[in-house]
Every structure is written in C-alpha cells, then in structure tokens.
Design a protein with these regions (language model features):
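Domain-level signal for soluble alpha/beta catalytic cores
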Residues: 1-367
C-alpha cells in the first residue's frame, strides 16, 4: 500500500529549525550589515542543505523549511493586496508564552498579485531533484479569525459577504499562481479549526459576539470556493494546527465539534491532523472522513520535544485510527512543523532529523 504521489505515507508539515547561518544573516540584514541579495544567498544555501537532509531521511517530499520566513503566516499576508501588518497591544497567548505583538488588518480590496513567495517556490522546485516540492501557505480563515470584523475596514467591506467572496477569490488566485509556477503539492496551514475544537476558545468566540458553528460553516464555504477549478494533478492538504510556538500550544479538545463540517464537507485532498497527545482527543471523529476520497495524515510524532516515540506505540495508534478510517487512507507525519516561527521549538537539529527518520521508518514498516 505504498503511495507514489502526495500525500505520502511518510510526510512532513513544513517548517524546520533555522540554522545559525540563517539566524545570523537575518540579524545582519536587520541591522543593515548585508543587503537583501546577500541574505537570499545565505537562505539559498541553507535551503539546499535542508532539502538534502530531508531526502537523506527517506522522504519523497521536501519543503524549504520556511527558512525565508519569520512567521508561518504573517510573511504570506504581507504579500497580499489590501492587507497590512500592524503592532498590536499584545501578542498571541500560548500556554505560558506570548508571541511578539503583531496583527494584520484589511485596509483595501483583497487580491493576489506577483507575490514574492512564488519565486521562493520556484527556487525550491529547481533544487528538489526527484523529490516532490511542497509549498505551505496559511489558510484563508486565518486572515479573518484573529481580528474578525474589527480588523476589516468597514468602508472597504461594509458587507462581510463581499469580504468572504474576495477572500475565497484571493486564495483561488493564489492556488492558480502557485500551480502555474510548477507547484503540484500545496498545504494550507489552519489554526482556526483547532480553535473551534476548544471549549475555552469557543467561549471567547461567543463573548465577542460570534457563533463558532456558523464560523465553521463559513470557513468551509470559503475553502470550497477557493478550491473551485483546482487542477486534477494538484494535491491540496489542510493542516489543522493547535498552535506551535517555542514548543507551546493554544488549543485543546478533540475534533468532534468540527468533524462533520470539516471532514464531511471541505474538499481538500488530505487532512494533516495533530494527534501527538491527549489534548487531541480520540480517533472517533475520523468516522466523518469520506471513504476513498481523502487521505488523513496523522501527526503522531511530536515536534515539541526531542524524546523519540516508541515505534510500536505509534504503530498501535495507527491501527486504532484504522477502526474509523480505512488504513489505505492513512499516512504519517510529525504533528506540526519544527519551527512555525523563526524562534523554533525546544529540541536540537539532530533530534529533529531523528524524528523525521522515525516517521519514514515506521511508514516503511506499516505500508
């Protein structure tokens, strides 16, 4: 039951720990010691190396490690039309840690033009060899959820229906642009579906005047509209992320509150689901995954610490998941990226690659 196309039995979410060379170069660029071209040359070399490392671990899919980004999402938003970043009053609260204080707001009509990440993907594709290059971008719901109505200029979008229509169109244009650049494997990273699983987050949603279940239906509609006309040879995955900043997290709670809408109606090709601890709940919500139509990539190997999982324990969990979704629809990956922001998680590069090798080893044994 090996798979020779995306998603792969052994897959990855995307980001890797930034090497010291990249960290130093970014500091030098920020202080004016080097220019953008010199920074990019350092990033190019680091990306070439991280691609080689992924292949050496037995992966058939490679990413650029998100080495050109400081954040998994803000850097993409910065390149959209009608969006600007601003300094907010406080960062995002994780479990005991707070991020830098940034936000994004919509100040004009949304659109996708000549985005700089298109060139980032072209470089990745040029050095991928026989491996499949995967591009990762945030999901459209992420742009809306954090600020909601207050971060959308009411003179530009007095009616949110028009905003959501343009949001979907912007992502549909992005999908087509990456496809035209040669991308055949695209991943949408989405923290919002995990928020909608958390009772604490659902309470906060109610307090701001929104309905979590209605938001879920809205985001499903936006995603499906963005996916309209997707070429048959393009694989699109949706990574449901519970928060991943310096080895901490935001959301806890099983997938049951969103399972029927998410798995039953969202037309992506694969769901990347975090299942590395008890906060993720059991596998019962997977019963809503449509038979034969979609893959479920189970994130059973944590990226939040360096201790290796017991392979037999992981295999047992795969068998448990197969009670709810067919085994041929299941793949394996780390639970998230290793560095969703440039700070990275609390493990070493050696431990990171041990984790990736564990994924490929287990997948080889099982499939």
């Amino acid at each position: 039951m090996q798979r020779h196309h995306a998603p792969y039995r052994a897959d990855v979410v995307g980001s890797f720990l930034r090497p010291d060379s990249v960290k130093q170069a970014r500091l030098q660029f920020a202080s004016g010691e080097i220019d953008a071209g010199q920074l990019r040359a350092v990033e190019d070399e680091a990306i070439r190396h991280v691609v080689e490392q992924q292949c050496a671990c037995g992966l058939h899919v490679v990413t650029d490690g998100e080495f050109r980004r400081a954040w998994w999402h803000f850097d993409f938003f910065d390149g959209l039309q009608g969006v600007e970043r601003y300094d907010s009053q406080q960062g995002i609260h994780f479990n005991g840690v707070q991020t830098k204080a940034h936000g994004v707001r919509v100040t004009g009509k949304l659109g996708f033009g000549d985005h700089p990440m298109l060139e980032d993907f072209r470089y990745l594709k040029s050095i991928s060899g026989n491996a499949q290059p995967k591009m990762t971008i945030p999901s459209p719901s992420v742009l809306h959820f954090r600020g909601g109505r207050k971060d959308i200029d009411a003179t530009v979008y007095p009616d949110l229906k028009d905003y959501f229509d343009d949001l979907a169109t912007t992502w549909r244009d992005a999908i087509r642009a990456f496809y035209d650049a040669g991308c055949r494997y695209l991943q949408l990273d989405d923290t919002v579906w995990a928020y909608l699983c958390s009772e604490d987050q659902r309470r906060q949603i109610r307090e701001r005047g929104d309905d979590a279940d209605e938001l879920a239906r809205t985001y499903a509609r936006v995603l499906n509209k963005a996916l309209e006309g997707k070429p048959d040879d393009l694989t699109i995955g949706l990574h449901v992320c519970r928060g991943n900043f310096r080895s901490t997290w935001i959301s806890e709670g099983g997938y049951e509150p969103v399972a029927e809408v998410l798995f039953g109606t969202v037309n992506v090709d694969a769901f990347f689901l975090e299942y590395d601890n008890d906060r993720s709940g059991d596998f019962a919500p997977l019963r809503f995954v449509r038979p034969g139509k979609q893959q479920v990539v189970l994130g059973l190997i944590t990226t939040k610490h360096g201790e290796l999982e017991n392979p037999e324990g992981v295999k047992a969990r795969l068998e448990e998941a197969a009670r709810y979704v067919a085994k041929e629809q299941i793949c394996l990956s780390p639970q998230c990226g290793f560095a969703s922001t440039e700070e990275g998680n609390s493990l070493s590069e050696a431990q990171q690659w041990d984790k990736v090798r564990l994924v490929t080893q287990i997948a080889s044994d099982v499939w």
